[in-house]
Structure formats: C-alpha cells, structure tokens
UniProtKB/Swiss-Prot annotation:
Secretion signal span: none
This protein's name: Centrosomal protein of 19 kDa
Pfam families found in the cross-reference section: CEP19 (PF14933)
Subunit description: Interacts with CEP43; this interaction is required for its localization to the mother centriole. Interacts (via residues 121-150) with RABL2B. Interacts (via C-terminus) with CEP350; this interaction is required for its localization to the mother centriole.
Organism: Mus musculus
Single biological process term from Gene Ontology: microtubule anchoring at centrosome
Known function: Required for ciliation. Recruits the RABL2B GTPase to the ciliary base to initiate ciliation. After specifically capturing the activated GTP-bound RABL2B, the CEP19-RABL2B complex binds intraflagellar transport (IFT) complex B from the large pool pre-docked at the base of the cilium and thus triggers its entry into the cilia. Involved in the early steps in cilia formation by recruiting the ciliary vesicles (CVs) to the distal end of the mother centriole where they fuse to initiate cilium assembly. Involved in microtubule (MT) anchoring at centrosomes.
Compartments where found: Cytoplasm, Cytoskeleton, Microtubule organizing center, Centrosome, Centriole; Cytoplasm, Cytoskeleton, Spindle pole; Cytoplasm, Cytoskeleton, Cilium basal body
PANTHER family: CENTROSOMAL PROTEIN OF 19 KDA, CENTROSOMAL PROTEIN OF 19K CEP19
Family designation: Belongs to the CEP19 family.
InterPro entries in the record: CEP19 (IPR029412)
Gene ablation phenotype (knockout): Severe obesity, hyperphagia, decreased energy expenditure, impaired whole-body fat oxidation, altered hepatic insulin signaling, and impaired glucose and insulin tolerance. Spermatogenic cells and seminiferous tubules show marked degeneration.
Length: 163
C-alpha cells in the first residue's frame, strides 16, 4: 500500500510525531500518531529520527518524509523538554544550519566540523550551476570598477624583510 505524506509535525505532551498522509488507493486523508518513547532532553535527535524512520510499524508511512525533517522535529521536541520556547529552539536550529563566515573552523571538534562540512556541501550542490541549467553561461567575464580605492590587507603591507 502506498502512502503520500502531506504534513508532518510534533506533539509535545505526550511526545509524538504526527503525520497527515493520503492513502493512494482510497484518496482519503488520514492522521497517524507515532508516540516517541524513551526520549529525553539529552537524547541524540539524529539517532531518534533514524530509529523512527526505520521502525517496521512506521516505515511505509515515513518513506516520503526526509530524515532532516524528522531530525528537526526531534530538535523541537528536545528543546521543549529542556524548557526552551519555540522561538529559542528555532534560533538554535538556524544557528546550527547556517555557516558563520567569521567562525574559526579550526577550533571545532570532529563531529561539529563534519556537520559544518555537510552543510557547506548541501549549499554548494544547491547553488551549483550545471551545463543543462537554463541560466548557465560558459565564459563569464566580470568587470571590476577601477575608480574605487583598493582595500589593503595586513599581509599585503608586510615588509619584504620578513621573507
């Protein structure tokens, strides 16, 4: 039986993931409540999302729901268990899913660095121009204004004696 996922959300009390789906054969919209058990404010959201998605009872319903979306729902649930407001949790998710250009990636541990690299890879794939794109131009020439004053950098102004 094939199910088409329409909406996916989270219920905080008692904790559950709620899926509104359409049965392909009948065409009726239905709601499935998947309780979240043994989840605390210290739980790993990625692991919990994978377990729910691979659960044999819910697997056929969650085929079309991306794992990232389930992870995000579990982050909302964990934030609620930690006592954070919805706005605070959304701000935390925004900080974790965006790259700060001023952040020193050398100071991050391996797990955080891998997360940042995966975010960069996703952004690269999303913004990459391919040959078959309608807006693709092979040889782009860019004119830079010559009348503006050039900004110097500290390594540009270093003396030659330092070398």
């Amino acid at each position: 039986m094939k199910y088409i996922a329409k909406k996916c959300g989270v219920r905080f009390q008692p904790p559950a993931v709620i899926l509104i789906y359409e049965n392909e054969t009948e065409g009726k919209s239905r709601q499935r409540i998947m309780p979240v058990r043994n989840f605390s404010k210290f739980s790993d959201c990625t692991r919990a999302a994978e377990q729910l998605k691979n659960n044999p009872r819910h697997k056929s319903y969650l085929e079309q729901v991306p794992l990232k979306q389930l992870e995000k729902l579990f982050v909302f649930l964990r934030g609620s268990l930690q006592g954070q407001s919805l706005a605070e949790t959304m701000e935390q998710i925004r900080r974790e899913t965006t790259i700060d250009p001023e952040e020193d990636l050398n100071k991050l541990d391996d797990k955080e660095l891998a997360k940042r690299k995966s975010i960069m890879d996703e952004l690269f794939e999303k913004n990459q121009k391919r040959k078959d794109d309608p807006t693709f131009v092979y040889d782009v020439e860019v004119e830079f204004p010559q009348d503006e004053q050039l900004l110097s950098c500290s390594w540009d102004t270093a003396s030659v004696d330092d070398f």
